Every structure is written in C-alpha cells, then in structure tokens.
Amino acid sequence: MRGQAANLVLATWISVVNFWAWNLIGPLSTSYARDMSLSSAEASLLVATPILVGALGRIVTGPLTDRFGGRAMLIAVTLASILPVLAVGVAATMGSYALLVFFGLFLGVAGTIFAVGIPFANNWYQPARRGFSTGVFGMGMVGTALSAFFTPRFVRWFGLFTTHAIVAAALASTAVVAMVVLRDAPYFRPNADPVLPRLKAAARLPVTWEMSFLYAIVFGGFVAFSNYLPTYITTIYGFSTVDAGARTAGFALAAVLARPVGGWLSDRIAPRHVVLASLAGTALLAFAAALQPPPEVWSAATFITLAVCLGVGTGGVFAWVARRAPAASVGSVTGIVAAAGGLGGYFPPLVMGATYDPVDNDYTVGLLLLVATALVACTYTALHAREPVSEEASR
C-alpha cells in the first residue's frame, strides 16, 4: 500500500518523542531524591505518577482513535504533552516535590500515545503483516532509552529547565511535521458509535482481559524497570546518576530492539509460543537479578537479557491482539490492553520502594513477586490461552 512505510516510520518517531517526554522524571529521580531529601516511598511515588495517568488515559485515547483516526490523535496527544513538560521543568527548578507530583500527573498524557499508534499502524497493514507493523511502532519505546541516556547529560550540559524546553520543542516540531506529512490509511473508516458502549463491548471480549493480563506483565515490567532502574542501580551498586542512566538506556534499548523481533516471530509461529518463552525467561532472569549478580558484566548480562525477554513478549502480545480483536474494536481493545500494560508499570516502583530492605540493601521481595507473577501468567497461557479462530482474526 502506497505510503505505508513512511507513515509507519513517522508514527514511530512521534512515539519516540512522546515516550521521552513521558519518562522525563525517572532518569532524574535519584537527583530529586537527594536534593529534596525524599524517602524511598516518596521517590517511588514521583516516578510512578506519570505512569498511572499514561495508563488510564489509554482507555480513552484508544476508542477516540477509532472515532477520529490515528493522524488527528497522534497530533493531539503530542501537542497536549508540551505544556506538562514545561510545567515539570518549572516545578523541578523550584525544587517543589508537591508540584512535581502534580504536574507529573499531566505528563502522563504523553504516555497515552501507544494506544493511538497501534490501531494507526494496524490500519496501514494487512493482518499477516500486523505483527511486523505493531512491532515497528513499538520501537517508539526507544524514547525511554534516549531519555535515560540523554536527560541527565542534558541537565548537566544545559541546565534543568532548558532540558525540558528542548523536549517541548521536539514535541512541537514533531507535531508540525505530522500535520504536513501524516495520513490515515485509505481503508480507515471512523467509528461514530459512542465511546462508552464501545468500551463496554470491548470489555466483554475474552481477548481483552487475557491480553491485558499478559501485557501488564511484559510491558509493565519494561515500563517499571525503565523508570525505576536508575534508583535500583544507584542504591544497589552505587553508580552515579549519569552512569545509572546509561545502563538504564541499555536496558530500554535492548527491549525496544527485541519488540519487533517478537512481532516478526509471531507472524511466523504462534504468538502464544512467543509469549510463553518471554514469560518463562522473565521469571528465570528476575530470579537471577534477585541474587544480586556482581556489577558490570554479570549484572549487565542479567538485566539486558531480561529486557530482551520483556521486549519479545510485548511484540508477541500485540501481534496476538491484532489477530484476535474484531476490526471495529481494535482501538477500544488496544486502549484497554495498553492501559493494563501501563498499570502494570505503575505498581512495581511502589512495591519496590515499599519492600526495599535498607539493612541488607536489597530488593529481593519485589523481584521475587515478579518471578511469581510471571510463572502464574506462563501457566495460564500454557493451559488456557488459545490461538484465534478465523472469525476473530478476520478483517
């Protein structure tokens, strides 16, 4: 289809910039905690707040994409994220924890971009290629890696508020380019039905809740680690904020690069098998992380491989969604599933902060909870989740 590659690439770039904006607080969390004398729980809440709003907002932006189209919604979310980015910069410059948490809520708007881009990418590709298209769009998660790597450095080079102004300018310029270049797929037809009934209809589909459960683990794990890993690394291994950001960027990049691999594999073998392998690997590697492997080589190998497992799983789950969700409900189902993924990323930082053992300096309890959850999901997928029948997968 003419224009599909260009539109997919541009939509992915829009996702990159919004994911960077969504993840602005996490890479600086250790600095905020030090400068504002925050407790572990307060720092965890600060990191988790944008994740919560980004998750819940996806329930709305998904069906709105069915109604107004991906082009309009990608532009709208990008523009709506500019002011919160600047407001967070002001609050950070003032050193106000309360304002940071408050404006961090609105920073979550940028995180809703995922529920917009998935149906947009779906509309441009045939069912047999949707694992690929959603995997490529999912590479927009690299924005978290860019944020983890560059945000602390930008603060050191340019200053705190200027860093936020740079991200706001990137959002604005991206929105302008999208207005000129981005187009909805020729086959897109707006769904004018009211949003609430469509959400209720999507909520009645078994695929919605099965995929929500699985995505809450694989994508939630990615989001949680991408935001909380700087705190984890500095606490456990004593690295500086910049060094922790670089290592977190490596984690996020590995997950991002693995996501299209998960989609590609799902186009060739059953997504169920891809997700099963992802969950089993996640459980094994989270257990290894709980043992606190030595810094550098062993810890890096553990977390990078964990990132690959999570990334492959995210690609596999959404390839599964693309096969099973009814065509008229893709946006609504995507919104709910994506929200579940975001919520899956909201609670782990809070749990990690609450279960941290300052005496032994470890997060063992939190990591073992991830092991148990991944094993439960793996067992459920093996025994109950099934591939779609042809009626579900038809478009």
Swiss-Prot record:
InterPro entries: MFS (IPR011701), MFS_dom (IPR020846), MFS_trans_sf (IPR036259), NO3_transporter (IPR044772)
Gene Ontology MF terms: nitrate transmembrane transporter activity
Biotechnology section: This protein serves as an immunogenic antigen, inducing gamma-interferon responses in whole-blood cultures from M.tuberculosis-exposed adults in Uganda, The Gambia and South Africa, indicating this might be a good vaccine candidate.
Induction, per UniProt: A member of the dormancy regulon. Induced in response to reduced oxygen tension (hypoxia), low levels of nitric oxide (NO) and carbon monoxide (CO). It is hoped that this regulon will give insight into the latent, or dormant phase of infection. Induction by hypoxia is independent of nitrate and nitrate levels.
Regulation: Increased nitrate reductase activity is seen under hypoxic conditions, however this seems to be due to induction of the probable nitrate/nitrite transporter narK2 rather than increased enzyme activity of the probable nitrate reductase NarGHJI.
A biological process from GO: nitrate assimilation
Effect of deleting the gene: Wild-type levels of nitrite production in aerobic cultures, but hypoxic cultures show no increase in nitrite production.
GO CC terms in record: plasma membrane
Record-linked Gene3D superfamilies: MFS general substrate transporter like domains
Presence of keyword Cell membrane: yes
Membrane topology: Multi-pass membrane protein
Entry-linked CDD domains: MFS_NRT2_like (cd17341)
TM spans (from-to): 8-28, 45-65, 72-92, 98-118, 131-151, 157-177, 205-225, 244-266, 274-294, 301-321, 333-353, 365-385
Alphabetized UniProt keyword annotations: Cell membrane, Membrane, Nitrate assimilation, Transmembrane, Transmembrane helix, Transport
Domain of life: Bacteria
Compartment(s) of residence: Cell membrane
Family statement: Belongs to the major facilitator superfamily. Nitrate/nitrite porter (TC 2.A.1.8) family.
Note: One of the activities induced in M.tuberculosis by hypoxia is the dissimilatory reduction of nitrate to nitrite, which serves to provide energy as the bacteria adapt to anaerobiosis.
Role of this protein: Permits nitrate and nitrate transport into E.coli. Involved in excretion of nitrite produced by the dissimilatory reduction of nitrate.
The protein's name in its UniProt record: Probable nitrate/nitrite transporter NarK2
Species in which this protein is naturally found: Mycobacterium tuberculosis (strain ATCC 25618 / H37Rv)
Classification of source organism: Bacteria, Bacillati, Actinomycetota, Actinomycetes, Mycobacteriales
